[in-house]
Amino acid sequence: LASQRPEPIPVFAEMSSVNPIFVMTGLGDAKMDEIATGLHGSATLGAGQFCTNPGIVLFPAGEQGERFVESFLSKMRETAAAPMLHEGIRKAYGQGVETLAGRDGVRLLLAPEETAGDGRCHATACVLATDARSFLSDESLLEEVFGPSTLLVSYEDSSELNEVAEALEGQLTAS
C-alpha cells in the first residue's frame, strides 16, 4: 500500500544486530576494567533496547579475560530492573535468553530475574558465555536477544578472533 503512493513512504529499520565488541589482547587490567564499565553502561542503557546495544563481546581467554568477565559481572549484578517497551518485548527477551542458555557450550553466568508479576513490565540484566569454537559451530548464537543481555565469547588467538569476525553478518555497529 505504501509503495503505491505517488511518493512512497520510506522505511528506515534496523532489524536485528548484535553489535559486537572486540576486546583485544595485551590491555592492562585498568583498561579492561574501564571497558567492562563502559560495556555495562551500553548493555543496560534503556534496558538494552537501544539499537546499538552490544549483544556479543569477544574477549581473550586466560587469566586477564577471566578478570574482565568478573569485573563486568559484578557491575551487571548491581543493575536494577528497568522498564521494557511492553510486555510482549519482555516476554520475548525471556524466551531469547532461555533459548541461548539452552544451546550447547553456552553457560548462563547471570540469569535475569522474573518480573512479570510486578505489573511493571521490567527486565533485569543477563550474561551468558561461550567460547569461539562453540560460537562458530552454532549459527543461532548470532541472533539478537533484544534487551539487557550480553553473550561473552572467549577466543584463544587472533585466528579464532578473525574467524568469529568473518562469521558475523552485517551489523549496525562494532567496536
Where are these regions (language model features)?
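Conserved NAD(P)+-binding/catalytic subdomain of aldehyde/semialdehyde dehydrogenases
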Residues: 1-61, 109-110
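NAD(P)-dependent aldehyde/semialdehyde dehydrogenase
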Residues: 59-172
